[in-house]
Amino acid sequence: MAFSQYISLAPELLLATAIFCLVFWMVRASRTQVPKGLKNPPGPWGLPFIGHMLTVGKNPHLSLTRLSQQYGDVLQIRIGSTPVVVLSGLNTIKQALVRQGDDFKGRPDLYSFTLITNGKSMTFNPDSGPVWAARRRLAQDALKSFSIASDPTSASSCYLEEHVSKEANHLVSKLQKAMAEVGHFEPVSQVVESVANVIGAMCFGKNFPRKSEEMLNIVNNSKDFVENVTSGNAVDFFPVLRYLPNPALKRFKTFNDNFVLFLQKTVQEHYQDFNKNSIQDITSALFKHSENYKDNGGLIPEEKIVNIVNDIFGAGFDTVTTAITWSILLLVTWPNVQRKIHEELDTVVGRDRQPRLSDRPQLPYLEAFILEIYRYTSFVPFTIPHSTTRDTSLNGFHIPKERCIYINQWQVNHDEKQWKDPFVFRPERFLTNNNSAIDKTQSEKVMLFGLGKRRCIGEIPAKWEVFLFLAILLQHLEFSVPPGVKVDLTPNYGLTMKPGTCEHVQAWPRFSK
């Protein structure tokens, strides 16, 4: 070959060499020094620049479950140039989040997280130090206290029961009105406002603006939040996407800005009526702690209250709305299950009084139905991403500090090693042999609210709320769809997975008042 031909090929050779060096550097950069006796987590080879973005696809819970079947409970992928460790298997996840909880309690510093309450959210903030832990306990205790505390002027056992009973009965009336007017309804639009009113009353008491246009706009657009705070969101791993036209990201920013402004306004208005000798809601309790902060260096400066209320509101809103919506659609899909719940309610509660939280132990089939909703739909497919706080190891694999961690809850709930026929909807799997109680061993295998030090602070109130809403709705109503209408149970991926829209649900009164 002539020298001139070599010269003409030089640009191509230089380009090929540059690409090779870049890929080699990226591979080397993604590898870490592994201590003796440990290994790097296994995983498939990714593509240059994008890593495993195409492999993860639009349904990461499914694609990463398939990869776990090939590579095991601890595997590693790359999204862009960022390494991500994916954990599957109940025992492996418990080992990481519970037994080694301090190692895995961090949050990755993701771009989408910085947009939530201006990057100061207790739930999404990378901070995991002692001040974060103390504020988390405070928020958890406040939420729990105003769930179980009782109003001496009320017949209800606690504030939560009082608020849910009121809203559930109002929802029954709304659904009957929709039936009288158009003969059918779409569940989400009916349920979302009622659930928001419950957590709003818990947070703000009588100061919550139930019917304000501002509040309704926020709750009806909450999907703009859950669609963006997801495991595998490309904008978190490819910075260039933040500067390109991105309607979903724009809606996400707008939602967060509007929500913070709404909470700031409501908190400020509530402060005008604050009486430290009459604490009747969560925000009042936080005001009192804020005053203690000024007096003796407590945990909550006043500016942090909005951030904490934001986390509490979020913990008690979207999960409950999604659970009730899925429940209604699965009830119309499996009418025999609905019939068994009706029979249990008629036997235990009857029709002369309203269901109460104290009825839970006597309504095991309803409880089993709810557990199967959580397991079968796995509508929180991943926890909010974790990160490691220090170099650690798991199952013989080295995981360095600040490694992003995905927890695949969907895989746990559909693991054939844990569940017989995991893709069949069967509430009976959670009952003891005589069907008289919940099988605790089975119920503890369901993952929906995370585990360990980042477990959802609203788990207990959310479970109580879902139970009482469904008990009251099903005491009064029978849900169905017209003959020939098929319900779409295909979930739409997000932080919480929503079912497809169904505008033809019907609710018929079971008895005359």
UniProtKB/Swiss-Prot annotation:
UniProt cross-references to SUPFAM superfamilies, sorted A to Z: Cytochrome P450
EC id: 1.14.14.1, 4.2.1.152
Alphabetized UniProt keyword annotations: Endoplasmic reticulum, Fatty acid metabolism, Glycoprotein, Heme, Iron, Lipid metabolism, Lyase, Membrane, Metal-binding, Microsome, Monooxygenase, Oxidoreductase, Steroid metabolism, Sterol metabolism
The keyword Flavoprotein belongs to this UniProt entry's keyword annotation: no
Compartments where located: Endoplasmic reticulum membrane; Microsome membrane
Family recorded in the similarity comment: Belongs to the cytochrome P450 family.
Purpose of the protein: A cytochrome P450 monooxygenase involved in the metabolism of various endogenous substrates, including fatty acids, steroid hormones and vitamins. Mechanistically, uses molecular oxygen inserting one oxygen atom into a substrate, and reducing the second into a water molecule, with two electrons provided by NADPH via cytochrome P450 reductase (NADPH--hemoprotein reductase). Catalyzes the hydroxylation of carbon-hydrogen bonds. Exhibits high catalytic activity for the formation of hydroxyestrogens from estrone (E1) and 17beta-estradiol (E2), namely 2-hydroxy E1 and E2.
Protein name as annotated: Cytochrome P450 1A2
Organism: Mus musculus
